[in-house]
UniProtKB/Swiss-Prot annotation:
InterPro entries: P-loop_NTPase, Thymidylate_kin-like_dom, Thymidylate_kin_CS, Thymidylate_kinase. The gene is tmk. One of its GO terms (biological process) is dTDP biosynthetic process. It comes from Chlorobium luteolum (strain DSM 273 / BCRC 81028 / 2530). Phosphorylation of dTMP to form dTDP in both de novo and salvage pathways of dTTP synthesis. GO terms for cellular component: cytosol. Pfam families: Thymidylate_kin (PF02223). The keyword Kinase applies. It catalyses: dTMP + ATP = dTDP + ADP. Keywords: ATP-binding, Kinase, Nucleotide biosynthesis, Nucleotide-binding, Transferase. This is Thymidylate kinase. It is an enzyme of class 2 (transferase). GO terms for molecular function: ATP binding; dTMP kinase activity.
Amino acid sequence: MLITFEGIDGAGKSTQIQKLAAYLKQEGREVLTLREPGGTEVAEKIRHILLESRHDITPVGELLLFSASRAELVSEVVRPALAEGKTVILDRFFDSTTAYQGYGRGLDLNMLRTLIAISTGALTPDITFYLDILPEEALIRKFSEKSLPLAFENEELDRMERSGLEFYRNVRQGYLDIIEAEPGRFKSINARHGVQEIHAIIVKTLNERFKEQS
């Protein structure tokens, strides 16, 4: 099973992925957790280029780098793991491309769909958990985590984190539009709930999905 987590930066994905992976391992499942961009030697190098704040990358260049990283991850790690019967949990997948590069950067959505199909080989998650939070609240969380003042020009932020509030508002709208188009694949969760409450919702939803597949 392929499980993906989506949401704007600061929504709490990493915490929930860790908790879900621990739960599934206790249930006897073999679990592999991965992140995008990253997950292979080549993809991790691409991640460094993408997030390094001193790099000035065009929207199309950014898109192609994300796509290259994804192609490596899917081919080298994700598909082999799924073939071995493992449960793969991905911190971001192609929905991030649509939301961030499509809605956030304003790139053509049809072009994105073509690149997504090429980079994933049409691989689609069995379920996607979307943690929804207002950009204003998410960014306060991110700045607080890094003990930084609320200023987007701060050099301690990575390149994506410095994109600004309006960018993240567009990204969130992108996610909402994606979910409206594919409601069956998504479970949208209010990220303002407590950590344990969100985890309980995820576990309940996933167990129901396991039953459907058995």
